[in-house]
Amino acid sequence: MATYTTSDFKPGLKFMQDGEPCVIVENEFVKPGKGQAFTRTRIRKLISGKVLDVNFKSGTSVEAADVMDLNLTYSYKDDAFWYFMHPETFEQYSADAKAVGDAEKWLLDQADCVVTLWNGAPITVTPPNFVELEIVDTDPGLKGDTAGTGGKPATLSTGAVVKVPLFVQIGEVIRVDTRSGEYVSRVK
């Protein structure tokens, strides 16, 4: 199995920590005036989703995680699982609710997603960065009502709720950033 040393650390690097695959979110090399240099990292455990701050002594090696990121197409959902298909081999993968997590509210039929596999099973599903969804419910925006925050909640076709500007109406299609859950623009 491949290993990485602290000099290889960079955001996005996947390795094993306590028997669980992790990804480095951010890292910083620290050389104190007195004592040994170390690398300060913030890692996210891929299975549990926990974010931890971990320090590694300079030169420490860690085992590479045997995970694969695949570009898969979302097919359908049944009672307990979401199904994704590889666009070239047509192989199907089923992901449970824990693996899908918050991505559920951004999944559209035939959407291209990045699915992270560990030991052949999906552990995380990442939806596209931007999705276009129709507004199915929102309060009507009254003309001249600009006092306050200038936004209102809107329910989208997938059930997600986002804050939108007052001029957006029911039936319009909007673009949403799935990473932050924020309104980006109207789609013409």
UniProtKB/Swiss-Prot annotation:
Pathway: Protein biosynthesis; polypeptide chain elongation. GO terms for cellular component: cytoplasm. Coiled coil: none annotated. May be beta-lysylated on the epsilon-amino group of Lys-34 by the combined action of EpmA and EpmB, and then hydroxylated on the C5 position of the same residue by EpmC (if this protein is present). Lysylation is critical for the stimulatory effect of EF-P on peptide-bond formation. The lysylation moiety may extend toward the peptidyltransferase center and stabilize the terminal 3-CCA end of the tRNA. Hydroxylation of the C5 position on Lys-34 may allow additional potential stabilizing hydrogen-bond interactions with the P-tRNA. One of its GO terms (molecular function) is translation elongation factor activity. It holds the Pfam family EFP. The modification N6-(3,6-diaminohexanoyl)-5-hydroxylysine is found at residue 34. One of its GO terms (biological process) is peptide biosynthetic process. Keywords: Cytoplasm, Elongation factor, Hydroxylation, Protein biosynthesis. It is found in: Cytoplasm. Belongs to the elongation factor P family. Involved in peptide bond synthesis. Alleviates ribosome stalling that occurs when 3 or more consecutive Pro residues or the sequence PPG is present in a protein, possibly by augmenting the peptidyl transferase activity of the ribosome. Modification of Lys-34 is required for alleviation. This is Elongation factor P. It comes from Haemophilus influenzae (strain PittGG). The lineage of its organism: Bacteria, Pseudomonadati, Pseudomonadota, Gammaproteobacteria, Pasteurellales. The gene is efp.
